């Protein structure tokens, strides 16, 4: 492929390193030229150098001095991204934010990404959001959703200090995403860190209460399965354990029909272990978002952009 957009990764920890391997394995319309961190002894930077990439511990300053870099994946921290967002915007670079900072609009690739290709900063919400919002949206587009709830269970070993410090932000941000992007009038999010050994795969339970009782169950199943295939295009380990289940249950709105879905996410194992599907879905989604932005920067009409 002759035309490619130069991109860089800011943050050389687990997320940044896994994303590096994904971009090298499947570059699409992107050319990864640099991985940047702040720790000169970082394993991620050492791996980047070994793969022939530019690697710097000078932080964002290194990227700001490189006008040819058009897209920057920020895999640092929310606090750092608040500062980075302003600097990257002033430098004319697009920021794809993998932190909870949310300086730009939330994006979920198969749901609303193409609405935001004119933005210079987009946010990937949370791992639970990337996993469950597509399913809520899939129900909502055929049966408007009154209430959506997700319970995300991840291996304790896959949750580093950043995840643990951001548990409250996770629940708030994911619930907001269920509403703003999923379409639910009210959203609720719960995360559980499971210490079991060997570590479990990421599992998510999603429950939706449609507004009207007379919805088409077959249409809901078809919509959810179609969305599953869309997400599998960039997260191959994303799979429903069964078709959606419909049950009459007591709710705060009286006895209602509840749509329940059980979802499992297995990582690709590019750098992070396969059980860390919660981290893998973030890096896979980031790669997808970067690819769509790269095609758009190269002049491809929005309706023709594919990833």
Curated annotation (Swiss-Prot):
Alphabetized Pfam families for the sequence: AcetDehyd-dimer (PF09290), Semialdhyde_dh (PF01118)
Active site per database record: 127
Reaction catalysis annotation: acetaldehyde + NAD(+) + CoA = acetyl-CoA + NADH + H(+); propanal + NAD(+) + CoA = propanoyl-CoA + NADH + H(+)
Temperature dependence: Has a half-life of only 1.6 hours at 50 degrees Celsius. When TTHB247 is in complex with TTHB246, its half-life is increased by approximately 4 hours.
EC number: 1.2.1.10, 1.2.1.87
InterPro entries xref list: Acetaldehyde_dehydrogenase (IPR003361), Acetylaldehyde_DH_C (IPR015426), NAD(P)-bd_dom_sf (IPR036291), Semialdehyde_DH_NAD-bd (IPR000534)
GO biological process terms on file: catabolic process
SMART domains referenced in this protein's UniProt entry, alphabetically: Semialdhyde_dh (SM00859)
Highest taxon of source: Bacteria
Keywords, sorted A to Z: Aromatic hydrocarbons catabolism, NAD, Oxidoreductase, Plasmid
GO-annotated molecular function: acetaldehyde dehydrogenase (acetylating) activity; NAD binding
Major enzyme class: oxidoreductase
Chain residues that bind NAD(+): 12-15, 158-166, 278
NCBIfam families reported in the protein's UniProt record: ac_ald_DH_ac, PRK08300.1
Role this protein plays: Catalyzes the conversion of acetaldehyde or propanal to acetyl-CoA or propanoyl-CoA, respectively, using NAD(+) and coenzyme A. The aldehyde substrates can be directly channeled from the aldolase TTHB246 to the dehydrogenase TTHB247. Is the final enzyme in the meta-cleavage pathway for the degradation of aromatic compounds.
Similarity comment text for this entry: Belongs to the acetaldehyde dehydrogenase family.
Assembly behavior: Monomer. Can also form a heterotetramer composed of two aldolase (TTHB246) and two dehydrogenase (TTHB247) subunits. Upon complex formation, the aldolase shows a 5-fold increase in substrate affinity, while the dehydrogenase shows a 3-fold decrease; the kcat values of each enzyme are reduced by 2-fold when they are in a complex.
Protein's UniProt name: Acetaldehyde dehydrogenase
Annotated organism of origin: Thermus thermophilus (strain ATCC 27634 / DSM 579 / HB8)
